[in-house]
Amino acid sequence: IKTQQILMDIDANLYPRQDIKRLGIAPLTSMFWYAENNRHQIRDWRPEIHDNDGLTMWTGAGERIWRPLNNPSSVMTNSFADTNPKGFGLLQRDRAFYHYEDDGVFYDRRPSVWIEPTGEWGEGAIQLLEIPTDDEIHDNIVIYWLPKEPVKAGSEWHYAYRLHWVATEPYPSETVARVSHTRLGNAGIPGQPRPKGGRKFVIDFEGGPLNEIAKLDKVKPVVSTSKGRIDNEYALQVVGTKNWRAAFDLYVEGNEPVNLRLFLKLGDRTLTETWLYQYLPFTYD
């Protein structure tokens, strides 16, 4: 899959005979058990087990988004509203064999799938379903496009799109860097008492404009959270590389999901795609 691609052109005409509460267009399924971002759920000798490690979106407004996948303890549904998306899909960005150590099914070779609308899809949302799993045999990830307009009996719907089965996204950005790793750990500073209720997030970025940025440039992380408190945020160049690393601590009470958002800036210039993450505190207890 590293050097091959398969293209499929889809042209669908739908004529519902009854009202449909949730019509999923261009559905994809996948499997995500555990990876760098949820090591606490490891139940196997292999370091990582997943067909894809993230949902990527290229919005109608031009924003590039990367959302790492989760293996929740209960079914989670998230919607990402958009108008006329340029594309979205499930990617396997981690291509290092030693991150999986599987010479039977070769998770490092699993394909990425990119959905490219070839017409205007209007208003709606990319919906992501994450289902609990404790084994690699279950497809527990689902994505699809959900139109905003109600689907009524007797209406007509037309959707055209192209499926790209590739190693990475077919239209990589030339203007922003991409997320390469998402890691979690205990909040605080080594050698000092660790505060309770805190989690450290470490996100690596690579490529794009970062190849031109010097390590002393004043790159800043822009972080936001739906609840809780952000502390100790910073960004630095990874020694010996052109990659940059952003990190921050999150302090939050309760077990409700927390939605996080981060990207890197230099002055008024956006350097990276947007990292979205849904932190599930209850999975760490």
Q: Residue locations for each model-derived region?
A:
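A contiguous, surface-exposed recognition patch within enzymatic or periplasmic domains that forms
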Residues: K21, I25, S30-E156, H164-E174
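Detector for glycine-centered tight turns/loop "hinges" at secondary-structure junctions
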Residues: D19, G62-E63, G228, R269
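Residue-identity detector for glutamine
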Residues: Q4-Q5, Q18, Q41, Q92, ...
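Residue-level detector of short, conserved catalytic/binding motifs and their immediate flanks
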Residues: I6-I10, L55, F88, F201, ...
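An exposed acidic His-Trp-rich patch
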Residues: D11, A35-N52, I189-G198, Y277
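Acidic, contiguous internal or C-terminal segments within carbohydrate-active enzymes
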Residues: I1-M31
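Terminal accessory/anchoring regions of large secretory-pathway or extracellular enzymes
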Residues: D102-D285
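Short, surface-exposed secondary-structure junctions/capping segments
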Residues: L14-Y15, D44-E48, D249-G254
